[in-house]
Each structure stands twice: as C-alpha cells, then as structure tokens.
Amino acid sequence: MQFSKMHGLGNDFMVIDGVTQNVYLTEEVIRKLADRHRGVGFDQLLLVEPPYDPELDFHYRIFNADGSEVAQCGNGARCFARFVTLKGLTNKQDIHVSTAKGKMVLTLKDEEKVRVNMGEPIWEPAQVPFTANKFEKNYILRTDLQTVLCGVVSMGNPHCVLQVEDINLTPVNELGPLLENHERFPERANIGFMQVVNRNHIKLRVFERGAGETQACGSGACGAVAVGIMQGVLDNNVQVDLSGGSLQIEWEGVGHPLYMTGDATHIYDGFIKL
C-alpha cells in the first residue's frame, strides 16, 4: 500500500489514496501503523475516498492513532487538499469534500497555505454532543482535579475550551484526560486551553480526543476562537499560536461559516505491506 507522510504545524498524518488503490483498514491495523517504533507513526490517518455525492470531489475520512474514526480534523483537511493535488487526483483550486458530519471546501492559496471553510460552529448541546439543558456561553464542569469554567462547541467534532492565564503553567496532561472523558461528553471531547494575548491573538494547547496533546489541532484552534468570539473576548480575525506554528482563524459570527488558513507540508512518500 502506497502512502504519504505529511504534517500541518507538526500535527502529523499518514495519508492514503483510496481512490486509485483498494484499501481495507481495521482498528488493529491502524493501531499498528500508528506505532512510532514499529510502524509508520502518526497522530491521525487520513483516507481519501471517491465522493459519495457526484457534485463533490472526494470523501474525507479520519482515524485517530487508537483506531477510532472521527468526523473532523482541521490540520488534516489542509494536508488532504495538498495531497490530492500533489498526487494528481485533482487540479481544482477549490476542492469540495464530504466528511462523516457534513461538507467542506478546501482552497489552495499558494504552495504552502491552504484555506479551509470549516462550516458553521455548532452550539446546540445535543448536537455537540454535550449534556446540558440549554446552550450557555459558559458551563461549569467538575473533575477530581478542579472545577472549571468552559465553552463547548462542535466543529464537526466536540470541543471544550478553557481560558487560562498561562498555558505553560496549566496541567494540560492531568486535566485534559479528565475533561476528555467527562460524563457530560458522551462521545468524549477535545480539550483546548486558551491564553488570550489580545483580541486578535491567542496561545493554545489542545489535548485531543484519542491522541493526547499534539503540536497543533486545527479544529481545536477553530473551536477556541469561536468560543472566544461568542464569549466576547476576541474579535473576528484571530492569530492562534500553537507549539507547532500559527493558524489564522476568521469568523463573522452566528450564521456564518468559519475559515482556517495555515500550512500543509509533504514529508515523504512510502510503501508498506499490510
């Protein structure tokens, strides 16, 4: 099976063309491939499939390193767009794809940048999914470590966002799994720790569902900015600094799609026998 290794700000992916080759993956196979010592190693595996809808270009599937399938990965979406172009699967500048939970438009800006229409943030608790009687800008969550105030949103996957004073002093790897697996998130959640620098600039660490803390999380950056705008602490165009690099997030507010712009880097091509 042929594959490519790619990354978006250090969030690394194994990308597989399921259009021109037959691909059958089980959770066990994905976990073996994800092993950084005995396999290829990655945060997520991205699978390019033919479109289910003739008006679209591709279907986009994402698997975490633990083998679980998820509906969204923002950094992966940028790499997906770069991959299908590099492999000659399309020559379009605007690439229309479906995911498990909706549709996306991926736009190639230049040889480095890709702009992704992430769709509208979803706030209704039942659709996140999150257990709450109604939407609120802030929710209180209690854990064994501490009680936190957070915003909750779906960008095609569930995000819980906490505002912190200093991301370097925040116990991300202790608090992250407690919130990821909190009983009010029936499908678990990605946990964002957001430090507001000013109204157009934040620093962010993300503890990803099924992957732990990664160098960058595109949908996490989108979720954090959406929550910050909804809570009134951010403006509509925000630079998000993650340990792997920076993303630019734009959102005009409720009723509008959210846009993410950032790099997508090809590392190498490979072949592995399953």
UniProtKB/Swiss-Prot annotation:
Substrate binds at residues 11, 44, 64, 74-75, 157, 190, 208-209, 218-219. Transmembrane segments: none annotated. It catalyses: (2S,6S)-2,6-diaminopimelate = meso-2,6-diaminopimelate. It is an enzyme of class 5 (isomerase). Keywords: Amino-acid biosynthesis, Cytoplasm, Isomerase, Lysine biosynthesis. The active site is at 73 (proton donor), 217 (proton acceptor). The record marks 159, 208 as: Could be important to modulate the pK values of the two catalytic cysteine residues. Pathway: Amino-acid biosynthesis; L-lysine biosynthesis via DAP pathway; DL-2,6-diaminopimelate from LL-2,6-diaminopimelate: step 1/1. The record marks 268 as: Important for dimerization. GO terms for biological process: lysine biosynthetic process via diaminopimelate. PROSITE patterns: DAP_EPIMERASE. Belongs to the diaminopimelate epimerase family. Catalyzes the stereoinversion of LL-2,6-diaminopimelate (L,L-DAP) to meso-diaminopimelate (meso-DAP), a precursor of L-lysine and an essential component of the bacterial peptidoglycan. Homodimer. This is Diaminopimelate epimerase. The gene is dapF.
